[in-house]
Amino acid sequence: MWRHLSIFILLFALSASSALAEDAQLAALFRENNVNGTLVLSLLDGVTNYTHNDARAATPLLPASTFKIPNTLIALDAAVIKENDTLKWDGTNRSVAAWNKDQTLESAFKSSCVWFYQELARCIGAARYESQLARIGYGNAKPGPEPTSFWLEGDLRISALEQVAFLKRLYRRELPFKSSSYELLQRIMIVEQTPAYTLRAKTGWAGYGNQAAPQIGWYVGYLETNGNVWFFALNMEMTKPADAGLRQKLVMDVLKQKASMYR
């Protein structure tokens, strides 16, 4: 119910806003970078919103590693990991060098370490995922068919609009998790922090390592600055490895334009 209500409120705010029409600045950024994708940018109160490619913004897609945001809270709630626990690397060399070592929750989140979160998923189990995803209203809440990969290549889907609605509930601490879990997640989500602003975010890349699958890049999070909180969700088609950096670049360019990031 919460998920549907949050999406309804966000959609209503967008429809009532003059920003619902294709935003010229956002469209220009995507066009200049030759990117097919979408971006939703919304203030906490939902009154001020900017969008690019409204149809794609409402299209549910695999969340990939952006699911590490709720997954971290679910793992802490299930007590399968603690803040200072370390999981031992199994010695298998994987494609990302930062994954080839022992991992803590913070290092695994920041490096987007797949094997670490898959190990947590084995401990969490399908039944707990099913109940937790329904309880927090994340996307379509379908954790199948495999409990260790449903966010990478399974049935779970979420749209950019739903990502923003979920992040707002996360920020307001409306989800059923302990304060200590919220505080830990807030800390490990920090990408950049200055006296003027704090940026918390997570990347994702659905289809990574599988060229037969659709390649979908994500960047979701929120920016706290000058008494305001801006929430964003970008997804885009990834056509080449160099596109990975465009996820962050596009969002940062938009934040500089719309959120007065450096004022």
Task: Give the positions of each predicted feature.
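Mid-domain, small-residue-enriched loop/turn segments at the edges of structured enzyme/sensor domains
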Residues: 97, 104-105, 117-172
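Structured C-terminal helix/loop/strand segments within mature extracytoplasmic catalytic/sensor domains
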Residues: 21-29, 33, 122-127, 174-198, ...
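Beta-lactamase-like hydrolase cores
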Residues: 18-62
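Positively charged n-region of N-terminal signal peptides that target proteins for export
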Residues: 1-4
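Bacterial N-terminal signal peptides
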Residues: 6-15
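Acidic helix-start/capping segments at beta-turn-to-alpha-helix junctions
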Residues: 86-101, 105-110, 124-125
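Active-site SXXK
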Residues: 60-84, 108, 232
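Short, well-structured active-site flanking segments
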Residues: 77-92, 177-181
